[in-house]
Amino acid sequence: TKYLKYEFELRRNLTIIRGDSATGKTTLVDMIRTHMNDGESGPVTLNCDKSCYVVEGNLWKGQLDNIQDSIVFIDEGNEFVRIKDFARAIQQTDNYYVIVTREGLSALPYSVEEVYGIRTSGKYGSLKQSYHSFYRIYPDSTTENIKPEKILTEDSNSGYQFFDAVCAEHQMQCDTANGKSNVFSYLKAHRDEKIMVIADGAAFGPEMDRVLQLVHTRENLVLYLPESFEWLILSSGILKDTEVAQILQTPSDYIDGKDYFSWERYFTALLTEKTAGTYLNYTKKTLNKAYLSDSTKNAILGQMMKGKQE
């Protein structure tokens, strides 16, 4: 008999499993399917806080309609994970999703931190028991030691306005890609410039493969991917709020995936709520000038430097 064991913890609504064939990705989904069909009397033991289901094929919509507060596994080869219709449908649910895929899924807002490969370790004696665990594929920043001449942000909201003001003080340029899916083409078009890319790690997962390839082949790019600009402000300590400090330590304990499909949305709501009616009153579209006062600005930039060194 061969024993296989998979052990992992899900932190967010969307977890992506990548990797070549024969790394055990499909075996994991097969085991969940077997348990779904045979239950406790079957060969698979499942130890989990939530029910687990496999959704597949053309009837995915109907299957999803019947699943609540569960973990949904989707194996590679299910083309529906690419379509906007699927992205819309899952954002109306309170489930967690584990999707096996080889390519980036541009319709889905998944975090760079929740893209995993499966590592196999340990064969125990004659039992041939192998233990599988997840490992993170992407870093949340790259530490190439370059002095950028330009900062590129993914959109033109408050984050861009903040970095644009900082750049102006340092005779640097700040540009926006007008959407995360344009970051790659912007970098290709500006191949000779030293650029620091700042994007929301909480939803940059689909772009990471191709952008990281550019970073690795060129000496003049550096990536900085905080959860979001709002997370950066909250982490900088300027609010001096103990509840915020607790939330930042283990966000997954506080964020209800049903209300906030992406952590970036949660941190925006938290910052907006915590600063309402104060001099730091935050809105996503237009940066409050209070964030450009020296002490506030330096606290935010200081948090960035901390993140780069960790």
What are these language model-derived features?
Residues 57-84:
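Conserved P-loop NTPase "ATPase switch" module shared by AAA+ and STAND
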